[in-house]
């Protein structure tokens, strides 16, 4: 496992994938697509409106977490099955991947069969007092927008 400082976040692709520029040391850097290890988030590119809404919320949550970081870094594993680097994002000692799970924006995932229960994520968010997630999901299902 290697650890790199992240010089720049180029793009947050979705709730579990980011494009970053990592600092290799000696004035060298490299752009990498990192698949967040150990988690899976709802898809933001799907025809299922409920999953899409929750996927976009996961992406927004990750965006806000990363923006609030003081010193973002990644601990990498091997490359994943689609050629992306697998990694754990950290801000100090805080493991952002696991925070996504405990706050209800991702499921734990070990690379096997995906157990996707949108209800389970919704229950975690509701227990933490995040009622906005349910409202946007309802709005997506009824094709209305909230103000």
Feature-to-residue mapping (PLM):
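Small beta-barrel nucleic-acid-binding modules, primarily SNase/OB-fold domains
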Residues: 1-147
């Amino acid at each position: 496992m290697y650890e790199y400082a992240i010089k720049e976040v180029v793009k947050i692709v979705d709730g579990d994938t980011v494009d970053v520029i990592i600092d290799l040391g000696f004035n060298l850097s490299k752009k990498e697509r990192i698949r967040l290890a150990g988690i899976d988030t709802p898809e933001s590119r799907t025809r299922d409106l409920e999953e899409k809404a929750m996927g976009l919320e996961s992406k927004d949550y990750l965006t806000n977490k990363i923006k609030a970081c003081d010193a973002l870094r990644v601990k990498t594993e091997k490359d994943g099955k689609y050629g992306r680097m697998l990694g754990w994002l950290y801000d100090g000692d805080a493991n952002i991947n696991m925070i996504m799970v405990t706050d209800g924006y991702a499921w734990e995932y070990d690379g096997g069969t995906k157990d996707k229960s949108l209800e389970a994520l919704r229950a975690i968010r509701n227990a933490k007092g995040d009622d906005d997630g349910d409202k946007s999901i309802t709005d997506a299902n009824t094709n209305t927008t909230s103000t």
